Amino acid sequence: MSISDNNMSGRSHDPEQIDLIDLLMQLWRGKVTIIICIVVAIALAVGYLAVAKEKWTSIAIVTQPDAGQLASYNNAMDVLFGANAPEMTDVQAGFIGRFSSAFSALAETLDNQQEPEKLSIDAAVKGQTLPLKVSYTGKTSEEAQKTLAQYIQQVDEGVAKELNADLSMSMETRLADLQKSLAAQEAVAKEQKTLRIAQMTQALKVAQQSNIKLPQVQQVDQVSQDSMFMLGSEALSSMVENEATRPLTFSDQYYQTRQNLLEVQALEVAPDSVHAYRYVMKPTLPIRRDSPKKAITLVLAVLIGGMIGAGVVLGRNALRGYKAKAE
């Protein structure tokens, strides 16, 4: 037996061996079926593209506000807390931190709606806390851009309102403390005046009883409380009258407290002047939609249609071959 005979014998004894040429010929003969399946798949894909909801994503990048955006707020903090006021960098970090937390809370709320909305916030650069990338997915590119800008403004206004409310509360507390301090210092000054008048009146009585009319000492600073009567009744009488009509005497601390009170009362922070963020990149107008992807959908339709058509052709031929063997 020749080698060719052995090969033919081996091929005839292996019925499960795949003949690629025969397989291709089967597919070619069933090309009409395959083409029909592809056309049907493309038609279904076109129908899907026509009814599927489009998704467009607008992106913005924000970071902490500039010092100029917080000038009035920072000035108010300096007036309220003086040397204990927080640094500008801490104020900026606090604002953007509140913005990030509020934005995340809003995104979670929108996601839990009956009709969820996709709003997100993440670090723009991996491994860095700032800047922040915020995005919104809408039905059209214009809607996505407009809605993202609205949500950023909404969060910014909310944060500014909260921080201004905290500032107003701090102002009220500071005013109350300063007013109490002034009242206490005024009470002390009144007590000191009353005490001085009482001491002078007592010295006047002693001088009158001792019949001392003229001063008996050369220098007034040498007179103590016990020897004040030595100033004489005439001088003491004038001193009592002058002390009674003289305004209260206050220390430098009183006037500093008074100045602080007036500065706090004059504080006024306009809510519109405070912002919790600064744009690095404003909301974009997307030019490519996220889904459905027309090109990818049509390519997949052709591939899936072709695979289904090929499966139909090969399956039909295999069934015919099985029936022929059975007969």
From Swiss-Prot:
Pfam families: Wzz. GO terms for cellular component: plasma membrane. Pathway: Bacterial outer membrane biogenesis; lipopolysaccharide biosynthesis. Keywords: Cell inner membrane, Cell membrane, Lipopolysaccharide biosynthesis, Membrane, Transmembrane, Transmembrane helix. Gene3D superfamilies: FepE-like. Residues 1-31, 316-327 are cytoplasmic. One of its GO terms (biological process) is lipopolysaccharide biosynthetic process. SUPFAM superfamilies: Bacterial polysaccharide co-polymerase-like. PANTHER family: CHAIN LENGTH DETERMINANT PROTEIN (PTHR32309:SF29), TYROSINE-PROTEIN KINASE (PTHR32309). Belongs to the WzzB/Cld/Rol family. This is Chain length determinant protein. It comes from Escherichia coli O111:H-. The lineage of its organism: Bacteria, Pseudomonadati, Pseudomonadota, Gammaproteobacteria, Enterobacterales.
